């Protein structure tokens, strides 16, 4: 342990694991962060809320929390609210931005109300007119749980009559289910650090779309950073990412995913307020392109820990 780092950050809990469907990914992210912080002399310790109560943060004398949890409880505002009441600084977005960002439906409503471009979408229910929605949004389309991450429960609907089955699959993960217009010009993501956009990344999945397997385990998913856009389109996407982040009240760091149409127009897809930090993760990739090592990125995120 480095005394300078001790005085700077105190005792740090790297919050990882948890009970969400994304536990496995969270453990990978958290271990990477833990190793990076310890390697720079930070007094960092693993903390799994599935194994011990949050009250242990106070009883064990932790001074700040690096949130490496994904999904429910970790990035939906619940944990953030608990840490606020304890007065313990934490990384990433606050309560409101985390809660809205976890909900793909409500975040799209906010972006749309702010005049920012989003793919057309519908909220589905048991009594929805699925045939009418297929006609309105067109095929193919995506169906996804509104409050689940890592593409869990996502289905690409290709043929008329398949929407009801896709809805039933998504309902296994969340009661709120979204149908979303397909935009076919490419998938991109933009990481944000301290409110500023990092270089965009183009995602070329080996699977038909960027699913759970492609995100975390396949080695044939192609990531291009620089993304290969001209300066005008790159800057426009970065600017839109910063706007989308600010409108939701984002702080610290995050990542916004985009779809681009055939004319090059970017559409805000969803926000990730507790991005992955695994070997396949995208924020570290964008940070490297901007001249930041993984270790430096972890320190920058930790430095921005806050209450309120």
From Swiss-Prot:
It comes from the Bacteria. HAMAP family: Dala_Dala_lig (MF_00047). Mg(2+) 2 binds at residues 270, 272. Its main location: cytoplasm. Keywords: ATP-binding, Cell shape, Cell wall biogenesis/degradation, Cytoplasm, Ligase, Magnesium, Manganese, Metal-binding, Nucleotide-binding, Peptidoglycan synthesis. It comes from Laribacter hongkongensis (strain HLHK9). SUPFAM superfamilies: Glutathione synthetase ATP-binding domain-like, PreATP-grasp domain. Its cofactor is Mg(2+); Mn(2+). This is D-alanine--D-alanine ligase. GO terms for molecular function: ATP binding; D-alanine-D-alanine ligase activity; metal ion binding. Belongs to the D-alanine--D-alanine ligase family. NCBIfam families: D_ala_D_alaTIGR (TIGR01205), PRK01372.1 (NF002378). It catalyses: 2 D-alanine + ATP = D-alanyl-D-alanine + ADP + phosphate + H(+). Residues 108-303 form the ATP-grasp domain. Pfam families: Dala_Dala_lig_C, Dala_Dala_lig_N. Binds 2 magnesium or manganese ions per subunit. ATP binds at residues 134-189. Pathway: Cell wall biogenesis; peptidoglycan biosynthesis. One of its GO terms (cellular component) is cytoplasm. Its EC number is 6.3.2.4. The keyword Magnesium applies. Cell wall formation. The gene is ddl. The keyword Flavoprotein does not apply.
């Amino acid at each position: 342990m480095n005394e300078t780092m001790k005085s700077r950050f105190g005792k740090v809990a790297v919050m990882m694991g948890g009970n969400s469907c994304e536990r496995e990914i969270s453990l990978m992210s958290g271990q990477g962060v833990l190793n990076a912080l310890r390697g720079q002399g930070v007094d960092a310790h693993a903390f799994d809320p599935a194994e011990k109560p949050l009250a242990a943060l106070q009883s064990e004398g932790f001074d700040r929390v690096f949130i490496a949890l994904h999904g429910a409880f970790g990035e939906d505002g619940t944990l953030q609210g608990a840490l606020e009441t304890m007065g313990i600084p934490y990384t990433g977005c606050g309560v409101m931005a985390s809660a809205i960002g976890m909900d793909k439906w409500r975040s799209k409503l906010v972006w749309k109300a702010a005049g920012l471009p989003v793919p057309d979408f519908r909220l589905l229910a048991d009594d929805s007119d699925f045939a009418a929605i297929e006609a309105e949004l067109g095929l193919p389309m995506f169906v996804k749980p509104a409050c689940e991450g890592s593409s869990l429960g996502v289905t690409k609907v290709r043929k008329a009559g398949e929407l009801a089955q896709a809805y039933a699959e998504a309902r296994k993960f969340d009661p709120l289910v979204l149908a979303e217009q397909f935009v076919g010009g490419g998938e991109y993501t933009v990481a944000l650090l301290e409110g500023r956009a990092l270089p965009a990344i183009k995602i070329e999945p080996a699977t038909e779309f960027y699913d759970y397997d492609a995100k975390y385990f396949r080695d044939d998913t192609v990531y291009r950073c620089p993304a290969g856009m001209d300066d005008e389109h790159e800057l426009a996407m970065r600017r839109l990412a910063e706007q989308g982040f600010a409108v939701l009240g984002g702080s610290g760091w995050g990542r916004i995913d985009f779809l681009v149409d055939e004319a090059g127009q970017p559409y805000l897809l969803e926000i990730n307020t507790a991005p992955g930090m695994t070997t396949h993760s995208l924020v570290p990739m964008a940070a490297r392109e901007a001249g930041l090592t993984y270790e430096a990125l972890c320190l920058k995120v930790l430095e921005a820990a806050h209450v309120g």
